[in-house]
From Swiss-Prot:
Phylogenetic lineage: Eukaryota, Metazoa, Spiralia, Lophotrochozoa, Mollusca
Disulfide bond found in the keyword field: yes
Intracellular or extracellular location(s): Secreted
Family the entry assigns: Belongs to the conotoxin O1 superfamily.
Expression (tissue specificity): Expressed by the venom duct.
Designated name of the protein: Omega-conotoxin TVIA
GO cellular component, as recorded: extracellular region; host cell presynaptic membrane
Biological source species: Conus tulipa
Length: 26
């Protein structure tokens, strides 16, 4: 999974916890 602070997409669930849709980071 992606480490916290990594850029992510709100539609993908590859973060360790969750993706922030506003900052687009885990």
């Amino acid at each position: 999974c992606l480490s916290p602070g990594s850029s992510c997409s709100p539609t993908s669930y590859n973060c360790c916890r969750s993706c922030n849709p506003y900052s687009r980071k885990c």
